[in-house]
């Protein structure tokens, strides 16, 4: 019997999840399909009830539903609870359990580009205050980094700092983030600013960026955002979102099937389908 997996979010026109997952299933010899469901916030409740009735085995969750989905689940695990965000839902004995593979997926991509593979005491600036930012901050906290979070809407950054008040974290205005950029070891963009098709935009000005800073962008389409292109021209080490995207997807598949997919196969397919 064909297993059914999928992705819910809005909008989903840019997503490479279906081609990545189906390539992984084929490589694994798994009889499964992965469908994208473009669901607006207003439709979320009805859509979840329909998916449950259809017997879907599991699904991923992306913008803007990572927080709102929690109200419709039977249970969430410890990591998802700490982040207040879910990106993976697993059907276990008829119960829907929320998990979050974004945090581990991101750190697995970041640590190899950090000089000594340690973030302890490193100063990290996170731009954005959505579900992806929650995952990144949770992951950085586990690594004992010193975190600043900044967002266009300052109140949202403050709310995030309060949520993670057990960590070494502060919320700062975006103009302060730009003026103090030279004090950070890692800069991470978790927003959708610069994502296809609006590829000319940047979430922060890099005028005060020091060359030793690692610049990371969770966006994977385009392969190099305007932010990463400028950082690269300045001589900085850069990290795009493909590693995190592949890693979180692979970890989701492990939760659903108990098997490890071929991540190199998944990455190859994503690269092939980028604009």
Curated annotation (Swiss-Prot):
A Pfam family the protein falls into: Shikimate_DH
Highest rank taxon of the organism: Bacteria
A GO molecular-function descriptor: NADP binding
Positions that bind shikimate: 15-17, 62, 87, 102, 220
Pathway participation: Metabolic intermediate biosynthesis; chorismate biosynthesis; chorismate from D-erythrose 4-phosphate and phosphoenolpyruvate: step 4/7
Keyword Amino-acid biosynthesis: yes
InterPro entries attached to this UniProt entry: Aminoacid_DH-like_N_sf (IPR046346), NAD(P)-bd_dom_sf (IPR036291), SDH_C (IPR041121), Shikimate_DH (IPR011342), Shikimate_DH-bd_N (IPR013708), Shikimate_DH_fam (IPR022893), Shikm_DH/Glu-tRNA_Rdtase (IPR006151)
Gene Ontology terms: cellular component: cytosol
EC number: 1.1.1.25
Annotated positions binding NADP(+): 78, 128-132, 151-156, 218, 241
NCBIfam families: aroE, PRK00258.3-3
Similarity annotation: Belongs to the shikimate dehydrogenase family.
Subunit structure: Homodimer.
Described function: Involved in the biosynthesis of the chorismate, which leads to the biosynthesis of aromatic amino acids. Catalyzes the reversible NADPH linked reduction of 3-dehydroshikimate (DHSA) to yield shikimate (SA).
Stated name of the protein: Shikimate dehydrogenase (NADP(+))
């Amino acid at each position: 019997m064909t297993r059914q997996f999928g992705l819910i979010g809005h909008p989903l026109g840019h997503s490479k999840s279906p081609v990545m997952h189906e390539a992984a299933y084929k490589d694994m010899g798994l009889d499964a399909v992965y469908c994208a469901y473009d669901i607006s916030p207003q439709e979320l409740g009805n859509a979840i009830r329909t998916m449950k009735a259809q017997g879907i085995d599991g699904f991923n969750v992306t913008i803007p539903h990572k927080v709102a989905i929690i109200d419709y689940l039977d249970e969430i695990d410890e990591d998802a609870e700490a982040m207040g965000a879910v990106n993976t839902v697993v059907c276990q004995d008829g119960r829907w359990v929320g998990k979050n593979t974004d945090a581990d997926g991101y750190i697995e991509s970041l640590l190899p580009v950090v000089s000594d593979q340690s973030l302890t005491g490193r100063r990290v600036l996170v731009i954005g205050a959505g579900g992806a930012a929650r995952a990144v901050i949770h992951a950085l906290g586990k690594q004992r980094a010193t975190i600043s979070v900044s967002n266009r809407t300052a109140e949202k950054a403050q709310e995030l700092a309060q949520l993670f008040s057990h960590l070494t974290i502060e919320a700062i205005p975006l103009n302060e983030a730009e003026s103090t950029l030279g004090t950070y070891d890692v800069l991470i963009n978790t927003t959708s600013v610069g994502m296809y098709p609006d590829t000319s935009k940047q979430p922060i000005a890099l005028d005060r960026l020091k060359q030793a800073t690692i610049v990371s962008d969770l966006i994977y389409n385009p392969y190099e955002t305007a932010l990463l292109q400028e950082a690269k021209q300045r001589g900085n080490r850069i990290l795009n979102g493909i590693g995190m995207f592949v890693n979180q997807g692979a970890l989701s598949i492990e939760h659903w099937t108990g098997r490890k997919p071929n991540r190199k196969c998944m990455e190859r397919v994503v690269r092939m389908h980028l604009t």
